[in-house]
């Protein structure tokens, strides 16, 4: 069989000619990269090969600028069942009915597509992350969505509001139809996201250890013939070039053209495939027959990435694919489009040839895919070989033939980094004459006000296993196994304003806050994932920001140890890197490392929420207040700029507080708990009084006099130094204080809960804040409504 006649004469062209030709074909490789490809395969590449390498060597797929830095992250721990080498990581959850169960977690970004087509971009982000978890053999039990948008009150307010509306609609329309509960997320607004919103997505699942499916051709393929089966929607041209698009700078003038790189979702087909239905039927039958299969989601890079990566992940395999066997939804598609389009709701399976007909019948007849979506089906598209070559045929010609590991291994750059000087200073200002009014201003500000306006559209209780819904605490909680009391907590965090000042502490604080939010509901942190959203790695100062962010995440994970294991890091078991979040004008997003944490609690009945429960309980502060208002909600709400003194994580004290809180909750000493972050101690107290709906009936009286230690009252109240506010049940104070002492934590009693629905804060005899819960709730609940509706 002949090689495709559409070869690119790399060896004969000048740099200018080669660069121009690749631009004509929409190939984003550099000239040097194209010449390197020719060297690696030993000849001039075909046009299809260049397209495939274009996606495989994109930043999105190859991590070519970030690989070296990612090695800083700790990925191993005694509880890790599968680290970050596949579509999702797995960490031990519990033993139940004689089986070991794991939590599966994946974390991705869909930033560029959501800026161009917000609804479709966000929806397909949810779809992709759910596939990542499903293809590990897991039952998907929850999602979360950390979102970053531009300034809703600035010069681009109309566009920002349009993007927010589209993203939120995409998330609920897809997630609700799919039947996966939304367990939480967070939202930040900042002008740096005007031209590049961030839509990060997290999904978690549950799987028995003996039912884990790997994204690789199994070793059994050396003993009997295996084939590749493509399942799902018919391939079209949607998302063609999507991975390359996600690896370039956004240009507003090209957004119309870029829309073709955004995929088209179909949650109803996904529901049939993923939600313990067709895919699970195939997996169950394989287990019954003692057959080992491989399964991989087809997302970024399309069939090219899915088929090559499942092959390369095996040991010593190649694959031979016939593109005419691929079911398509459009006639006349070129082979490069069939290979690289990112049509949604697709998987690739590696199964024994003797099992293939039964697999096809399960999808096509039992689950009737062709009638669920026109043209959807399962088809055998190729066979596994032992020559370690990646061979693809189309109409009698070989369009790709290269060593499979050359295709998938990508390249690696050592980028230049240069520290970015920060010129900001701490603002010099007189304390507000009315701290009650100042607190109301902060409570109504974009980055503090209630997110109920957004999450009320999400179905958080589908599946019937949700214990804590969005708004009830800083982490969502789900009880996934019937007859088992163990529960999983999920939190996501990362403050971009910290990253603007110091990306290292931005990364470290993201880890610490995610772990605190799990701890505050009673869950012991078990593992982390990260999504590293940064600017252009080819610019030394922006690459320095990225490196510092990674270092911050890594140092926090290493120093906030896994409970019960001295000096054993809390492992980072999955993640994603999103670079080139920069506009054509050269403006990049605020350095935004976003971290998710999963925690475990043995008894869901011990779970704790934010809202104060009953009068007469003691209220304690864990965590000293420092002059750390850099990047704070207080400075932002009062128009005081960024500041400089960003919160720092004091490893030993942070670790001690986290595990003191989880132990206290496990003993039943705690009625309510809130971590201290955005808005500081003042906002934490207010949120505990208000509860998720702004209508709490239990207030508190707090004396912060002993907290001040020379700090001005407003700085102590609004400092975002880390910590917790804890409501301790009446009669449990002595035991709580003793438990804290065992951890080396000094609890400071602020006061007690009261039954008059008021928040009163004083410093000795000086009253600082006196507000009704109703007045706070009105401002806090309606803040986002007013901001987004104009």
Residue ranges and their predicted role:
Residues 1-790:
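Glycine/proline-enriched, intrinsically flexible loops and inter-domain linkers
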């Amino acid at each position: 069989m002949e090689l495709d006649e559409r070869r690119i004469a790399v060896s004969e062209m000048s740099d200018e000619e080669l660069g121009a030709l690749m631009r004509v074909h929409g190939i984003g490789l550099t000239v040097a990269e194209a010449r390197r490809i020719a060297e690696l395969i030993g000849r001039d590449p075909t046009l299809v090969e260049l397209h495939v390498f274009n996606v495989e060597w994109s930043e999105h797929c190859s991590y070519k600028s970030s690989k070296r830095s990612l090695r800083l992250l700790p990925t191993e721990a005694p509880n890790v069942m599968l680290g970050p080498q596949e579509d999702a990581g797995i960490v031990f959850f519990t033993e139940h009915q004689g089986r070991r169960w794991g939590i599966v977690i994946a974390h991705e970004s869909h930033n560029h597509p959501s800026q161009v087509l917000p609804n479709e971009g966000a929806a397909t982000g949810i779809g992709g992350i759910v596939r990542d978890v499903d293809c590990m053999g897991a039952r998907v039990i929850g999602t979360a969505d950390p979102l970053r948008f531009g300034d809703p009150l600035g010069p681009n307010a109309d566009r920002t509001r349009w993007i927010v509306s589209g993203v939120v609609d995409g998330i609920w329309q897809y997630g609700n139809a799919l039947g996966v509960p939304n367990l939480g997320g967070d939202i930040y607004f900042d002008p740096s996201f005007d031209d590049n919103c961030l839509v990060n997505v997290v999904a978690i699942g549950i799987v028995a250890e003996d039912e884990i499916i790997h994204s690789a051709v199994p070793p059994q393929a050396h003993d009997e013939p295996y084939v590749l089966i493509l399942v799902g929607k018919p391939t079209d041209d949607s998302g063609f070039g999507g991975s390359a698009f996600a690896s370039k700078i956004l240009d507003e003038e090209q957004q119309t053209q870029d829309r073709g790189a955004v995929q088209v979702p179909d949650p109803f087909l996904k529901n049939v495939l993923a939600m313990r239905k067709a895919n699970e039927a195939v997996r169950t039958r394989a287990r019954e027959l003692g057959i080992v299969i491989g399964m991989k989601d087809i997302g970024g890079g399309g069939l090219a990435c899915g088929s090559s990566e499942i092959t390369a992940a095996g040991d010593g395999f190649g694959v031979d694919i016939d593109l005419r066997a691929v079911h398509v939804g459009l006639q006349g598609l070129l082979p490069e489009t069939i290979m690289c389009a990112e049509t949604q709701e697709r998987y690739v399976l590696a199964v024994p040839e003797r099992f293939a007909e039964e697999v096809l019948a399960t999808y096509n007849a039992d689950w009737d895919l062709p009638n669920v979506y026109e043209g959807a089906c399962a088809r055998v598209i190729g066979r596994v070989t032992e020559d370690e070559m990646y061979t693809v045929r189309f109409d009698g010609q070989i369009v790709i033939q290269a060593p499979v590991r050359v295709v998938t291994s990508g390249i690696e750059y050592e980028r230049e980094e240069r520290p970015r000087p920060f010129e900001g200073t701490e603002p010099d200002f007189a304390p507000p004459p009315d701290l009650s009014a100042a607190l109301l201003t902060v409570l109504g500000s974009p980055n503090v006000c209630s997110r109920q306006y957004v999450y009320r559209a999400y179905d958080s209780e589908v599946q019937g296993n949700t214990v804590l819904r969005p708004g009830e605490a800083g982490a969502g909680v789900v009880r996934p196994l019937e007859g088992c009391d163990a529960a999983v907590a999920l939190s996501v965090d990362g403050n971009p304003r910290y990253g603007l000042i110091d990306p290292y502490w931005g990364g470290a604080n993201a880890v610490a806050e995610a772990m605190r939010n799990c701890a505050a509901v009673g869950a012991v942190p078990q593992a982390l994932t990260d999504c590293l959203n940064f600017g252009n790695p080819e610019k030394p100062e922006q690459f320095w920001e990225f490196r510092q962010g990674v270092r911050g995440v890594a140092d926090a994970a290493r120093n906030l140890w896994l409970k019960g294991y001295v000096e054993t890091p809390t492992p980072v078991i999955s993640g994603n890197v999103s670079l080139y979040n920069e506009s054509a004008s050269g403006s990049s997003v605020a350095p935004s490392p976003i971290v998710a944490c999963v925690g475990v609690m043995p008894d869901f009945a011990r779970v704790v929420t934010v809202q104060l429960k009953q009068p007469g309980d003691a209220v304690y502060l864990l965590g000293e207040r420092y002059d750390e208002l850099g990047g704070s909600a207080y400075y932002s709400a009062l128009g005081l700029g960024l500041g400089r003194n960003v919160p720092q994580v004091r490893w030993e004290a942070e670790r001690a507080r986290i595990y003191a809180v989880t132990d206290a909750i496990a003993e039943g000493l705690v009625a309510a708990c809130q971590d201290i972050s955005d808005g500081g101690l003042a906002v934490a107290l207010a949120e505990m009084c208000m509860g998720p709906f702004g209508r709490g009936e239990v207030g508190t009286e707090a004396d912060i006099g002993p907290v001040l230690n020379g700090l001005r009252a407003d700085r102590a109240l609004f400092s975002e130094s880390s910590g917790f506010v804890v409501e301790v049940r009446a009669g449990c104070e002595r035991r709580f204080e003793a438990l804290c002492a065992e951890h080396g934590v000094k609890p400071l009693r602020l006061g007690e809960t009261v039954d008059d629905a008021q928040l009163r804060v004083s410093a000795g005899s000086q009253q600082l804040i006196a507000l009704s819960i109703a007045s706070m709730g009105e401002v806090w609940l309606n803040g986002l409504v007013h901001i987004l509706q104009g």
